[in-house]
């Protein structure tokens, strides 16, 4: 499964942005001072009922990702121009819990980005295109 760094708000988190910065540091070693937060995208609900508040930030300095063992198997990059091109998204479907579900997918090389992650990226693509 391909997903963004993230998790739930901890008691010490001021808001979703603080939680996102903390989780990115914990999961891939991204120092918070290496990014400039642009803002938040519209919240998304997963098919399993989780509420996701995507936080968009610009990487200001290069860093070497250090995946947290046991939680992150691999970190990879996809060019922003590829993700913003609506032509790269497709709608697919599969049976899940007895029902047929449709979802976005945006394959990149050997990686199959789909579900909530692809839906968030598609929402970003749509918003930039407005």
What are these regions (language model features)?
Residues 117:
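NAD(P)-dependent dehydrogenases' Rossmann-like dinucleotide-binding region
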Residues 1-9:
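Short, His- and charge-rich active-site/binding loops that engage polyanionic ligands
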Residues 8-109, 113, 122-130:
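Unchanged
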């Amino acid at each position: 499964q391909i997903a963004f760094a993230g998790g739930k708000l901890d008691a010490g988190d001021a808001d979703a942005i603080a939680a996102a910065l903390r989780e990115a540091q914990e999961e891939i070693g991204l120092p918070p001072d290496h990014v400039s937060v642009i803002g938040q995208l519209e919240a998304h609900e997963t098919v399993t009922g989780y509420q996701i508040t995507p936080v968009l930030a610009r990487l200001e300095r290069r860093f070497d990702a250090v995946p947290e063992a046991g939680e992150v198997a691999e970190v990879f990059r996809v060019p922003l121009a590829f993700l913003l091109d609506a032509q790269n998204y497709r709608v697919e479907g599969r049976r899940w819990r007895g029902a047929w579900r449709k979802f976005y997918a945006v394959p990149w090389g050997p990686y199959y980005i789909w579900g909530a992650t692809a839906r968030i990226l598609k929402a970003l693509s749509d918003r930039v295109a407005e």
